[in-house]
Amino acid sequence: MAASRDADEIHKDVQNYYGNVLKTSADLQTNACVTRAKPVPSYIRESLQNVHEDVSSRYYGCGLTVPERLENCRILDLGSGSGRDCYVLSQLVGEKGHVTGIDMTEVQVEVAKTYLEHHMEKFGFQAPNVTFLHGRIEKLAEAGIQSESYDIVISNCVINLVPDKQQVLQEVYRVLKHGGELYFSDVYASLEVPEDIKSHKVLWGECLGGALYWKDLAIIAQKIGFCPPRLVTADIITVENKELEGVLGDCRFVSATFRLFKLPKTEPAERCRVVYNGGIKGHEKELIFDANFTFKEGEAVAVDEETAAVLKNSRFAPDFLFTPVDASLPAPQGRSELETKVLIRDPFKLAEDSDKMKPRHAPEGTGGCCGKRKNC
């Protein structure tokens, strides 16, 4: 069995892998960091097209971490790398919002900073609304990031690279405002990752060696104080390299996007029927909130206490009308929709179910999450 590595050694290996070994996303050995995301709205595609090619080519994320309703928000991007997602978000939050990117790899931070003036000029902003910091995502206080200072934290295939996941999530909880959200894509394992996989430098750099057992996410989130994780999308990860495939054995991996909300400590919310008013840009007809709930404009949907609390206490509150479920007519046969609805929380099940629905031959240009040019 390979000897385990300490945290400092892992950090140095990750810095070397992303700062020196990888030059473009084409150098990746697995599809862990280029898996598909959910369909991208046109306004986000347009924002992606405004990002400089040099920045996009150094992007190694595992999805597209752009949540909804971003105008005027303060957003923190953990492991911002070359700054691709930051520059997309910069356009979406607008001049009154702000985006901060933090990354431990100085080479990547310098790439992001190099193109700051270019992007602000392209977006037509009088003053920069993006800041890039060099630091560790599990030590945000050391980088000067204040408590309860952000509406949203995003992370794109990065938390798995850090040995202490709980410390990362604890710091995220600290810097989020009440009602704030961590919206993040990451890699998860089907079982506790064996030591020989954890000790493999390439597999760790490829986001597999440090992957969290998917069931542990809910345990850590509850311990810290987050609401239960809400699964959004999931895709099975494939490994084309035979040597790496042999090391992985029976351990399977999935790229998944989750939402974690930090809510104020108030009395539990009641079950409700909610009606979406269609007020969110790019999602006027329907809001796909997660794998379990899609809200169509003007249509009443029964939600559980947890979902009601999230919608009422987050930035989404103005977009919904809430009615206590008892005030509505009972569902047929005396059972409510909530009693018959089975919530999907297992990313492997969601990925497998999604694969069954996909065409056998994908259309040209849909490789990875963003097609051949990684520009969605």
Swiss-Prot record:
The keyword Signal does not apply. InterPro entries: Arsenite_MeTrfase-like, Methyltranfer_dom, SAM-dependent_MTases_sf. Keywords: Cytoplasm, Methyltransferase, Phosphoprotein, S-adenosyl-L-methionine, Transferase. GO terms for molecular function: arsenite methyltransferase activity. Transmembrane segments: none annotated. Its EC number is 2.1.1.137. The modification Phosphoserine is found at S47, S336. Belongs to the methyltransferase superfamily. Arsenite methyltransferase family. It holds the Pfam family Methyltransf_31. GO terms for cellular component: cytosol; mitochondrion. Residues 354-363 have a biased composition (Basic and acidic residues). This is Arsenite methyltransferase. It catalyses: arsenic triglutathione + [thioredoxin]-dithiol + S-adenosyl-L-methionine + 2 H2O = methylarsonous acid + [thioredoxin]-disulfide + 3 glutathione + S-adenosyl-L-homocysteine + H(+); arsenic triglutathione + 2 [thioredoxin]-dithiol + 2 S-adenosyl-L-methionine + H2O = dimethylarsinous acid + 2 [thioredoxin]-disulfide + 3 glutathione + 2 S-adenosyl-L-homocysteine + 2 H(+); arsenic triglutathione + 3 [thioredoxin]-dithiol + 3 S-adenosyl-L-methionine = trimethylarsine + 3 [thioredoxin]-disulfide + 3 glutathione + 3 S-adenosyl-L-homocysteine + 3 H(+). It is an enzyme of class 2 (transferase). It is found in: Cytoplasm, Cytosol. Residues 354-376 are annotated as: Disordered. One of its GO terms (biological process) is response to arsenic-containing substance. Catalyzes the transfer of a methyl group from AdoMet to trivalent arsenicals producing methylated and dimethylated arsenicals. It methylates arsenite to form methylarsonate, Me-AsO(3)H(2), which is reduced by methylarsonate reductase to methylarsonite, Me-As(OH)2. Methylarsonite is also a substrate and it is converted into the much less toxic compound dimethylarsinate (cacodylate), Me(2)As(O)-OH. Its main location: cytoplasm.
